[in-house]
Regions:
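A membrane-topology feature that recognizes alpha-helical transmembrane segments
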Residues: 1-197
């Protein structure tokens, strides 16, 4: 009997009380909840980006922290620690020192957790886009949060396609600034909804 209670408690880590039958999220339910929360966060960020051309720091930082907690829960400790390390490396001067530290940390992150080496390389690539001024800080934080939260780098493919379409439309309209969170939301929405179709 004690083994069943312990097993029930171990399975029911979501914080619900153990009564007769514990209510625990299965993998499918957890996946749906995570995707819903992700899409709501991205939608709110998109509204701010369209309205003010700026996403508030608490939204992006909250998303990044939430993704880190979820990543640790799923065993993606190396990408989470790499993200934390890259936020600290961003303050180093000169740029050569930042880049050397970032590359070294990413290599070690990939070595220590080979299953997550691709995610670490993607996180480094996204950070480099910010480092060279190609992308804004809010966009980078959201992309890293999405990559860790989903745990699959292929989510960036529909985001890149949506960004390309948005870029073509912006160039036809002679726009200089593009609210990229729109592409992030549309790509993530497609990635989440496509398997359900």
């Amino acid at each position: 009997m004690a083994g069943h209670v312990t097993a029930g408690f171990a399975v029911c880590v979501s914080g619900f009380f153990y009564l007769e039958r514990p209510f625990c999220y299965g993998a499918k339910e957890l996946y749906l909840v995570v995707n819903f929360v992700l899409l709501v966060l991205l939608f709110v960020c998109m509204i701010y980006d369209l309205k003010d051309r700026e996403v508030p720091m608490p939204l992006t930082l909250g998303g990044l922290v939430g993704a880190g907690v979820l990543g640790l829960f799923h065993g993606l400790w190396s990408p989470v620690l790499l993200t934390i390390a890259l936020t600290h490396v961003a303050d180093f001067n000169p740029r050569e020192k930042r880049l050397a530290f970032a590359l070294t940390l990413s290599a070690f992150a990939g070595i220590f957790q080979p299953d997550a080496a691709l995610l670490c390389a993607v996180i480094l690539s996204i950070w480099m886009l910010w480092e060279f001024g190609i992308m804004g800080g809010a966009d980078v934080k959201l992309l890293i949060a999405i990559t860790i939260m989903i745990g699959n780098a292929t989510i960036l493919i529909p985001i890149a396609v949506a960004g390309g379409i948005q870029g073509v439309i912006a160039s036809l309209r002679k726009q200089r600034e593009i609210p990229f969170v729109v592409s992030i939301f549309c790509g993530a929405l497609f990635f989440v909804l496509f398997p359900l179709i």
